[in-house]
Amino acid sequence: MDYSFDTTAEDPWVRISDCIKNLFSPMMTENHSHMPLQPNASLSEDDGTQGHSDGTPPKLETANGTSKVYRPADSSAVKKGPPVAPKPAWFRQSLKGLRNRASDPRRLPDPALSTQPGPASREHPGPHTQASSSSSSSIKQRISSFETFGSSQRPDRGAQRLSLQLSSGEATKPVGKHEGGRLPGLLGRGAAPTLAPQETEQLLSSGSPAASEVRDPGVSESPPTGRQPSEKTLPPGPDPLLQLLSTQTEESQGPVLKMPSQRARSFPLTRSQSCETKLLDEKTSKLYSISSQVSSAVMKSLLCLPSSITWGQTPCIPREGASATSSSNADSAANGSAETSGSDTGFSLNLSELREYTEGLTEAKEADDGDHCSPQSGQSVISLLSSEELKKLIEEVKDLDEATLKQLDSIHVTILHKEEGAGLGFSLAGGADLENKVITVHRVFPNGLASQEGTIQKGNEVLSINGKSLKGTTHNDALAILRQAREPRQAVIVTRKPTPETAPDLNSSTDSAASVSAASDVSVDSTAEATVCTVTLEKMSGGLGFSLEGGKGSLHGDKPLTINRIFKGAASEQSETVQPGDEILHLAGTAMQGLTRFEAWNIIKALPDGPVTIVIKRKSMQSKGTPAAGDS
């Protein structure tokens, strides 16, 4: 049913009918009736009257000019008189009441959600409010918009506070009054948005006790009993909010407090694991501990000695007699003899010789032959060690078995004397983060200290430098230890020469290094069986017809320059003068030893076209397979 009336301004000289006056009767609040919030909403049939929008009793002007509140008994016998103003006085007074009510909710913490039923009629005027003037409706709209936009809150926070105020506001109502009605006062000002179904489901799932079903927007609901404002019945808002926040913080702090204990329990370090590791690396760790102990002890003793001591007083073999050729150098190192180069380079000794001195300290061991200075070198090292360190070393040696004692023959302690800031004369290869796990000597520089001393050779495993063990270190850490050895005036390097018999016993990861060193040793021994010949090739625009491999600084270390493969259709293929694997000694009168592959290729390209004389070294069929393994 449509209750729309004429929206023209009310004429003060026209008599107001009783039915319109009954709409503003105060019985609306006494009989718990409510004006519908929507324009076409159905009226409450139980009460038979409609509630005023602001909940205040209407007032009309009497003959004396005073406003009088209408009562049901007096509604039929009201004295009418001519008005003194274009607008009735009761309208102005009711508007003042609306303004007073509008100022009250601003004192609450959440003004946008206060449960006042009054402002609903401002946005959606009913039949009685459409008879008012357009100017008064604009004022009411301004007040409504001011109240609405004055409270700017986020939707999610508003939904949380909405559920809290619903729980406090509806606790005083009977259960039966929730049926078929809407949430009172939630949409009172009209500008506040209605609850979406998703938000209502969130309120229901959050466990709020006041979250009720979604109301039908077309059905009205009775307000609470009494004329007191609904905000007076609300308990303080922060209390339930603090409860929700406390529960959320407890839930969030629960797993955070458990994190340290879980982390501590997830990484245990048991004794069984450490014992297994010790059992697996027992032999290797003993060798490393002995070498590191000797290295650190000698290094400490050297640092304590005055710098004026010259090491030329140590008896030794001159450099010229000690290393006439590379083969004699390797043989002397394998036999355990210590070699020194002169007064300023240093000396070296075998750990097996040091063991003999530790077993018989009181007995003076004399050298049988005069061609080596190992007893003097061993005695000098013994003199560097303190009594406590010497006792520890004796205990370590006594606990070793025969197999481990034999491995001491390949371990050498080299002491180098140098200037501050000078390098040791060799580079390192390998590391725990690389394919070759063992730290080895990659290259010995020709004019460096290690080359002058003669003990440290390419392919030797480096156990420690200046008392710092290199076992299990990465490549960068090993290089850092090598750079730190530049500062002192002395350097103590413990190296081990790998052999095919001892390499698998020490560590399985040294197999590759042992095979490479063994192949290089065999290639040195098989030099006597190799044949050196001179061939002549035709140099054309495409080169000599073969490619090179090896050279200084190659991927496999410093290797001799050899022929890799022969190109098809070349003159060298047809003549069969050269073969893959032949080592190039001289090319057009230029020695090729010590050159890189790039330098050798530049020499070949610079040659003029024509015949070129090449001196090659070809190994016999018996020893040809072994050096190929070393080159691979």
Swiss-Prot record:
Keywords: Chemotaxis, Cytokine, Cytoplasm, Nucleus, Phosphoprotein, Repeat, Secreted, Transcription, Transcription regulation. Residues 412-497, 534-619 form the PDZ domain. The keyword Repressor does not apply. GO terms for biological process: induction of positive chemotaxis; leukocyte chemotaxis. GO terms for cellular component: cytoplasm; extracellular space; nucleus. One of its GO terms (molecular function) is cytokine activity. Residues 406-502 are annotated as: Interaction with PPP1R12A, PPP1R12B and PPP1R12C. InterPro entries: IL-16, IL-16-like, PDZ, PDZ_sf. Residues 184-197, 321-338, 508-520 have a biased composition (Low complexity). Residues 30-270, 320-347, 497-520 are annotated as: Disordered. The keyword Acyltransferase does not apply. Disulfide bonds: none annotated. The modification Phosphoserine is found at S222. Residues 139-153, 199-209 have a biased composition (Polar residues). Interleukin-16 stimulates a migratory response in CD4+ lymphocytes, monocytes, and eosinophils. Primes CD4+ T-cells for IL-2 and IL-15 responsiveness. Also induces T-lymphocyte expression of interleukin 2 receptor. Ligand for CD4. Homotetramer. Pro-interleukin-16 interacts (via PDZ 2 domain) with PPP1R12A, PPP1R12B and PPP1R12C. Pro-interleukin-16 interacts with GRIN2A. Pro-interleukin-16 interacts with GABPB1. Pro-interleukin-16 interacts (via PDZ 3 domain) with HDAC3. PANTHER family: PRO-INTERLEUKIN-16 (PTHR48484:SF2). This is Pro-interleukin-16.
